[in-house]
Each structure stands twice: as C-alpha cells, then as structure tokens.
Amino acid sequence: MPLPESVGDLVVLHFETNLDDHGISIGRAPCEIHEICWVILDGKTLEKQHCESCSIREDSSRHGICGSASSLTEAIFTLDNSIQERLNFQGKPFTFVVMNGRELRVLLPKEARDQGITLPSYMRHPRLFDLSSEYAKWQIRMGAVPPYTITLSHIFGKLDVDSLPPITESKAIELSPSDAPYITKGLTQCWRLANATTLLLRKAEKDSRGHSLPSVLTQPINCQADARSFYAERSKIVHVAGLTNDVTQLELESWFTNHGVHPVALWTLKTPEPYKSTGTGFVLFASHEDAADALAFNGYCLGDRMLEIIPSSTKVLDKASDILIPFPSSKNRPRPGDWNCPMCGFSNFQRRTSCFRCSFPGPTHVSAATGSNTFSPDFPYGNSYGNGSSHFIANYGGSVHHSNENTMQSDLQHQNGNNAVNHHHSSRSFGGNVPFRAGDWKCGSEGCGYHNFAKNVCCLRCGASRATAAVVADHASGPVNGSYSHNSYSHIPPVMSTSPPNHSVYPYSQLSINSVTANHGQNFGGQNGGNVSRFDDHGRFKEVSRPSVTTDQGDWLCECGFTNFRRRSNCLRCNAPHYSNMQIPASLPSDFNAYV
C-alpha cells in the first residue's frame, strides 16, 4: 500500500552515538555523533533504493557504500549530497524516519551548533516520523499496552525484523564481496530499522481492513510548520521534553533564569502517580522574545539530561488544559496513609499517632474520639487537615518537611528553637483537648501566660523565671489557669524572620559558661558538685544530687539549657545564635544550672 503523496519517499536515518536508550551519555564523555547512516525507501513500493554510511574518524576513506569523514561537517555534507542527488534534484518530497525524534530535533542541531556548522533548512526544521511513537500508536490500535520505554531490540523482536534478508544478502543493493567486511554496526542497525519500517507498514495495512491508508506513518511531525506558526502568532509558549521524572518547579525555573530568561508559569501532564512528572511540560514566558530566546537552549543539559525545547502555541495549551498540573514542588513522595498535621503542616508517617513536630493528635486519635475519619476542627487557616497549613506556617515562621531521616534532626531543632508551631492551642480552637506534656509550664508573669516546654528554664516570650511559673502535673491535666477562648491567639509567639535574630528573640543564647559562673558563682555551671533544685513530675521542687561538671574556657549556655562548645556559633539543640557580648538578663534564676 503506497504512502500518502505528501509523505513521499522515506529516508531512514540512524546516528551512532554514546547515548543510551534514555538519551543519557554513557560514561563521562560528552554526547558525540560517531557515524551517520541512511537508507532511502520508495514511498510507493517500500523498496530500498540506496543505503550509505559515513563514519567520523581522523582520516577519510571509502569502501563501497561505507565511507568515513574527518569531521561532522564532512559527514553532513555527504548526507546532503546523497539526498540532493536522489530526491531533491528530481523534485521528490521525502520524510525522515528515525527511531527517536530527539536524534534529529535535538542531537544533530546541538552538535552542529557546538561545532559551528550550518545545517540545510530541511535538517534545521525537518519533517519526520518518530518510529517509536508510530509503533506505540499501532500497539494501542491493536489493543495492546506499549512498554514505557520502546527500544530497537523490542521493536525488532515484536516485528520479527530478522525475517527479512540482512544487508549482506539483499539483492536491492549491489554489494561486492570485498565491501562486505567494511559494513559497520551502525549501517546494519539502520538497515534493520528500514526493515522494521516496512514490516510495521505491512502489519498496519493488514489491520486497516480495507481502509485506503494505513493507520501509521501518515501524519509526519512538521517542525518547519510549527516554527512558522510560532513566529507568526508571536507565541510565548514552548514545549520542554527530556526532563527527569522527579524534576521540581523550582529546579526548572532556576534553570531558565540562569540562562537569562524568566518563565511566568510551568505545567506538566497529569500522571497516575501524583508526585511524579512525565518528563515533559509547557513553559509560558512574559514575552515572545523570551520564548524565542528559550528555543536557543534546545539541546542544553539539565543535570545529565539533554532537554528538547521546541515551539508551541496557545491552541496546543488550550487543548491540553484539562490534563495540565504544576510541576512537583518537592522531590519527597508521601506514601499512602501519611498525613499532614493540621496545626503545623508537618508531614507525618502513617504509624505516628501524633505529630512528630508539635505532638498534635493524629487522625486516628481524632476519629476515635469523634467517630469521624477526617479532621473537622474550627481551624482559622484551613477547612480540613492538610489544607491551609502552609498559610499558617508562612505566617508563623514554620516550614513543611517530610519526616524522613534527613529532616528529622533539623525539624527537631526548629521545634526546640523557635516554638513557632507548639502544640498549645486551646481545645476549643482545634475541636479536641490538647493537653500539656508533663513538665510543661505556663508563664506566671502578668499579661504573658506563655506556654513553655519543660526544657525551657525561662519564658521564651518575656524572659521571666520558671521559679514563679505554674507547672502542669501530667498529660491528663488541661492548660493551667483556664483555657484560651476561641478567638484568642495571644499565646502564639512572635513571627521569627529569616534574618539574624535580635537579642530579644534569643535572650539567653549569648551567655558563656564562664561569664555566668563569674556572676552567679559555682552554683551555675561550676566545677563543684552538690545538691541542686529541680522540678519533679508534679511541678514541685526537689533536691537532687548533681555530679561535678567541668567546662572549658569559652563554652556557653543556650536559652534552651544546652551547653555548647566554644567553637559553635549556633546552639546544637535549638540552632539559636550566640553573641558573646550580650549581658546576662536580670530574670536569669540563680539556680539556672539545675535545668541544664
């Protein structure tokens, strides 16, 4: 069955490179084209008209249909002469056939640009068939599911390419016995690719059941028409392919920004796995000029992937609008059952019954108490758990991280250091009783009432001593001195910016052990042992024995009670900064060392 007249003859093209099936360079060497091979098929009979190869080596030679050139420029010139002689001069239309369209749309233009080669117009904006896509189209038409990655070996096996004679036994090509030893691997692959094209058309013709045209290899990709439309419409949209499946919005934005263009919006396509990208997407720019400049980055690498950046249009974007979503914002992929804390937004593993960061009860506790499977708190920053929490965190200095091994320690330090998302909201604010933990205490200073963790020896808000505070006895006890009203959020600490904190935020992080000892004697971090006062589990003072503590010159004591070596500029526990010239606050208790 002949191909449509608009398709014309087929030029099966194959490049021998150091890329694997995924377009990634093998080894550390940059991508290079080692050989160009081509086979010309008649568009009406599918008979092979000509085949040739040109290897890129240091010396130039020719052995029949196999030749070599000293540079890519000479190899492209040889290919152009062959096409001009057999097709263009005779006025025959033709279409390229490649295993992967990226070879002709990305790889060849990149190599030509890097080496300063001017490609013929039909190679800069080719008309081509992507054989892997055409094969997938045929598989879907037959009711089969094509593999995620279609390789040459897969196509050759499914189409039984070896049923056709190899190049050395073909009668269509006059090959002398002396030339047979010079047949290269690349030319053999190109010949098999031409056989696969022929077999695919035959199978499609058989399956078309009387239709005038086959179902494959009828509508080529016309890069020249796409480019004309892009510049005529002054489009601001480009299509990007070749991305890794876990690329994030920030990575892609930064990549374009680093190359001098600033994208306005980026989208990828929906996938069954919500946290996984398809490796393709659309990028919208503020102006047509920026989008045109972005096309010049076609073939540039993001990591170890070579990107394909081609023109697109508003029409294409509108047709795909129903399946477009933003790129993932993070590489973390929550597993089924993981839940987001409605109070601080922290992502917790399924097994956790309370939030790892702020101890807010998990969904199992709430559902057990209310008989519901979802959170339904009267939450001022979101209507359900997992929604609106990022707004809460943005206003109160928190951050959202998945509770994996790499972020556990840093999240604990944030929890200890800034207390921006403590678990002391009132029971009425969150639809359930949120008790203090044993040892937690509420500041007794007038007008403060701040809820401090048990480790805090002084109020983190006003600096008042813990000695005058009321202490919760155990987990069963509610907030001391009553609970907060529904609209009261005065106990939320001030927002902590990312700029270096002032002395009022970390009032005790500036103290050195030796300066405290000089002002308060041996009872504070001194070298003598003895009995010191500590709070017991019921909030009462008790005398406990303390072993001798030896501190080095310059060691300093943080607000959280952690003793840091002098070399540390930030507290190891809470990350509070240390300023050696800060004065000791008057509210520092004389027995401060008892809580270290």
From Swiss-Prot:
Subcellular localization(s) per the UniProt record: Chromosome; Nucleus; Cytoplasm; Cytoplasmic granule
Modified residues (Phosphoserine): S176, S429
Disrupted gene: phenotype observed: Abolishes siRNA production from the centromeric outer repeat region. Decreases H3K9 methylation and impairs heterochromatin silencing; simultaneous disruption of dpb4 exacerbates the effect.
GO CC terms in record: chromosome; cytoplasm; nucleus; protein aggregate center
Keyword Transmembrane carried by entry: no
Main location: nucleus
Keyword vocabulary terms for this entry: Chromatin regulator, Chromosome, Cytoplasm, Metal-binding, Nucleus, Phosphoprotein, Repeat, RNA-binding, RNA-mediated gene silencing, Zinc, Zinc-finger
Miscellaneous note of the record: Shown to localize to the nucleolus in PMID:16823372 by overexpression of a C-terminally tagged allele, however this allele was subsequently shown to be non-functional in PMID:33693625.
Protein's recorded name: RNA-binding protein involved in heterochromatin assembly dri1
Organism: Schizosaccharomyces pombe (strain 972 / ATCC 24843)
Top-level taxonomy: Eukaryota, Fungi, Dikarya, Ascomycota, Taphrinomycotina
